[in-house]
């Protein structure tokens, strides 16, 4: 099949683009190609900037804007246009579906496909080793494009309240909050394989971000063997695994100040009812099945 990618930058490591890198690799392994014209299907990430035809247009939609600090209706306007003309819509989580339909209404042809991880690549990556990390018995980690709703402060507080005597926390990414502690290390921006190497060494991966749709870092950390710690508001718990620690959290699907998340009570832990598949090969086949049904 010939596929057109829309609104994708394969040189970027943002959430949607990092997923694009994964699915492109799997599509190509299966013998599919990527073209700009004469395509069988167009896979559009979030919104169409090229005025593509609605025929064979599939929108991969993780979420929409709802932050009352901005004009979210204006921010959503082109996403809504793409949603209305797309032949099919792929949501990243049940949360994403509920979010989008509560603002945009129902679409006649949708599916939910959670993000996946490249297990063949992960198998080749070795757990990270260095003179600092090797001093600790248990490694905890977290990684994100840090902004207030990602709750770095809460991630750190959770670690400080639950760590063992010989545990450390490795924080990847550019932090928006600092806490000085001998057991906490800020490692900066890491490339994808170094992140995987960190996850493979981590016993726990903390992601208490508020209202995330389907964070790739959680999928990758889980695939690397880390136990996930997350909150219940958003789609994170859907990809965190049955053994995840889930902190009770809430949201009413109404516009809100995204960068002012509510406080968490770490004692309010709930059992995770989700156990999604994270094998990228199976995820890719789900995309193909949805994009080709009734056509080939």
Language-model-derived ranges and their functions:
Residues 41-69:
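Active-site proximal beta-strand in glycosyltransferases
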Residues 83, 197-202:
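Short alpha-helical donor nucleotide-sugar binding micro-motif in glycosyltransferases
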Residues 95, 116:
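Carbohydrate-associated surface elements
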Residues 129-150, 156-161, 169-170:
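Conserved donor-binding/catalytic core segment of Leloir-type glycosyltransferases
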Residues 176-196:
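Nucleotide-activated donor-binding/catalytic signature segment of Leloir-type glycosyltransferases, i.e.
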Residues 210:
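Aromatic "clamp/platform" in nucleotide-sugar-dependent glycosyltransferases that forms part
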Residues 227-230, 237:
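Short hydrophobic beta-strand element within catalytic cores of glycosyltransferases
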């Amino acid at each position: 099949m010939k596929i057109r990618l829309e609104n994708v930058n394969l040189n970027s490591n943002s959430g949607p683009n990092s997923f694009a890198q994964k699915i492109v690799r799997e599509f190509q392994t299966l013998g599919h190609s990527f073209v700009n014209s004469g395509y069988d299907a167009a896979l559009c990430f979030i919104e169409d900037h090229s005025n593509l035809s609605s025929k064979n247009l599939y929108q991969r939609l993780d979420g929409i804007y709802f932050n009352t600090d901005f004009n979210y209706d204006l921010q959503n306007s082109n996403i809504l246009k793409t949603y209305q003309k797309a032949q099919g819509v792929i949501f990243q989580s049940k949360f994403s579906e509920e979010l989008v339909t509560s603002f945009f209404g129902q679409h006649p042809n949708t599916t939910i496909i959670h993000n996946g991880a490249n297990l063949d690549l992960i198998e080749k990556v070795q757990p990270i080793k260095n003179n600092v990390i090797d001093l600790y018995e248990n490694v905890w980690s977290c990684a994100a494009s840090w902004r207030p709703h990602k709750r770095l402060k809460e991630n750190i507080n959770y670690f400080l309240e639950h760590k063992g005597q010989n545990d450390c926390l490795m924080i990847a990414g550019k932090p928006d909050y600092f806490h000085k502690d001998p057991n906490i290390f800020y490692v900066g921006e890491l490339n994808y394989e170094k992140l995987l190497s960190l996850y493979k060494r981590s016993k726990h991966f903390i992601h208490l971000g508020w209202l995330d749709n389907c964070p790739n870092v959680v999928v990758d950390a889980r695939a690397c063997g880390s136990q996930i710690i997350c909150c219940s508001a958003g789609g994170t718990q859907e990809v965190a695994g049955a053994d995840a620690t889930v902190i009770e959290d809430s949201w009413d699907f109404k516009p809100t100040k995204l960068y002012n998340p509510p406080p968490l009570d770490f004692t309010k832990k709930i059992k995770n009812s989700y156990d999604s598949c994270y094998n990228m090969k199976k995820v890719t086949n789900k995309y193909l099945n949805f994009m080709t049904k009734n056509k080939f």
